[in-house]
C-alpha cells in the first residue's frame, strides 16, 4: 500500500485527517491559551511520512546553516546557550558595544505558506515525487476536534505544517532558513574570529546579533518585511 501511495502521489482520506485533543496546562484552565493541543495521526501515515523524511532530509540538512540548532542530530539547547556565551565573551574582549534581539514569531509553525514551501523544496533539488506527496498531503489535510461531547466536523486547513508529523520539523527549519537568508542577505556587520555571525536559531526561536543598535533595528525591520512575504508575523510582546 505504501508503494502504491508513493507512486500515484495520493494519500487516503484517513491519512490526511487529523484529530485534535486538548490537554490542560494548569488545573483551572479557562482560556484556549491554557490548553495544549495534541494531534492524533494515523499510524500508517506516520510510517509513510518517516520514509519521505529519510528521502529528503539530506538535501535539507545540506542547506541549513550551522546557526540552526533545533531538531538536529547531536545539537540541542545547551549548544545554543554555549554559542551565545562564547559570542558574548569574545565580543566583550574586542568591542565595548553589541546589540542583541530575541525574536519570537507568532504561531510560526501554523503560518507556513505551502506555495512558498514548495518553491523552496524545488529550489534545493527535492524530487518531484516527494514534492507531489508533500503538496498533496497538505492540500488534502483536514482537522477535527475531539471534545467531551463528541467530535466536531472536519475542516480544511490552508497553511502551516502538521503538528505531530516528523516531516514538520525539517520542513520548518528549511522555511526559516530561507526567510532569514533573504532578509539578512549581504549583511556583514557582526564578526567573531573573522566569521560573520548575525543569527542563532533554535527552530522558531531566533537571536539577532549586531554591533550597533541602529544596524540591529534595520535587521528587525527587514525581517518583519520579508517575514510577511513568508506569511509570518512577529510577536511584538515577546520580542525583546
Placement of each model-derived feature along the sequence:
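Conserved pre-catalytic core of RNA-dependent polymerases
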Residues: 1-175
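Active-site palm subdomain of RNA-directed nucleic acid polymerases
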Residues: 55-68, 171-205
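Structured loop/turn residues at secondary-structure junctions
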Residues: 43-44, 195, 211-212
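Methionine-biased hydrophobic packing positions in alpha-helices, especially
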Residues: 176, 219, 232-234
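Short, conserved micro-motifs composed of acidic
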Residues: 234-240
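Catalytic palm subdomain of template-directed nucleic-acid polymerases
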Residues: 108-124, 161, 199-230
Amino acid at each position: 500500500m505504501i508503494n502504491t501511495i508513493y507512486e500515484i502521489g495520493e494519500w487516503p482520506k484517513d491519512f490526511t485527517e487529523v484529530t485534535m485533543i486538548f490537554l490542560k496546562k494548569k488545573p483551572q484552565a479557562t482560556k484556549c491559551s491554557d490548553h495544549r493541543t495534541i494531534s492524533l495521526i494515523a499510524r500508517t501515515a506516520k510510517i509513510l511520512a518517516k520514509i519521505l523524511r529519510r528521502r529528503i532530509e539530506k538535501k535539507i540538512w545540506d542547506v541549513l546553516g550551522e546557526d540552526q540548532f533545533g531538531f538536529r542530530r547531536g545539537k540541542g539547547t545547551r549548544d545554543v546557550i554555549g554559542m551565545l556565551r562564547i559570542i558574548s565573551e569574545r565580543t566583550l574582549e574586542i568591542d565595548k558595544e553589541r546589540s542583541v534581539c530575541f525574536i519570537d514569531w507568532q504561531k510560526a509553525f501554523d503560518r507556513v505558506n505551502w506555495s512558498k514551501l514548495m518553491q523552496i523544496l524545488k529550489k534545493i533539488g527535492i524530487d518531484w515525487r516527494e514534492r507531489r506527496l508533500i503538496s498533496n498531503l497538505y492540500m488534502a489535510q483536514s482537522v477535527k476536534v475531539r471534545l467531551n461531547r463528541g467530535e466536531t466536523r472536519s475542516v480544511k486547513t490552508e497553511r502551516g505544517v502538521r503538528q505531530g508529523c516528523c516531516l514538520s520539523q525539517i520542513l520548518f527549519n528549511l522555511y526559516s532558513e530561507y526567510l532569514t537568508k533573504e532578509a539578512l542577505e549581504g549583511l556583514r556587520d557582526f564578526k567573531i574570529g573573522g566569521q560573520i555571525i548575525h543569527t542563532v536559531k533554535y527552530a522558531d526561536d531566533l537571536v539577532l546579533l549586531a554591533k550597533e543598535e541602529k544596524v540591529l533595528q534595520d535587521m528587525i525591520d527587514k525581517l518583519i518585511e520579508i517575514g510577511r512575504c513568508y506569511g509570518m508575523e512577529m510577536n511584538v510582546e515577546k520580542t525583546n
